Amino acid sequence: MRTKVTLACTECKQRNYDSMKNKKNDPDRLEMKKYCKFCKKHTLHRETK
């Protein structure tokens, strides 16, 4: 089952993106490098609760 997750910037802690993830295939926290409009650069975004 796919669940909705929120991705937050690791530098400024802003929650910028929503994504879907399959908990069976990805039990760990999701991490992606994405653009943060608050930092104005590409940063690591991590899954939040």
UniProtKB/Swiss-Prot annotation:
Transmembrane segments: none
Keywords associated with the record: Ribonucleoprotein, Ribosomal protein
Record-level GO cellular component terms: cytoplasm; ribonucleoprotein complex; ribosome
SUPFAM superfamilies assigned to the protein according to its UniProt record, in alphabetical order: Zn-binding ribosomal proteins (SSF57829)
Ribonucleoprotein among keywords: yes
GO biological process: translation
Coiled-coil residue spans: none
PROSITE patterns: RIBOSOMAL_L33
MF-aspect GO terms: structural constituent of ribosome
Family of this protein: Belongs to the bacterial ribosomal protein bL33 family.
Stated name of the protein: Large ribosomal subunit protein bL33
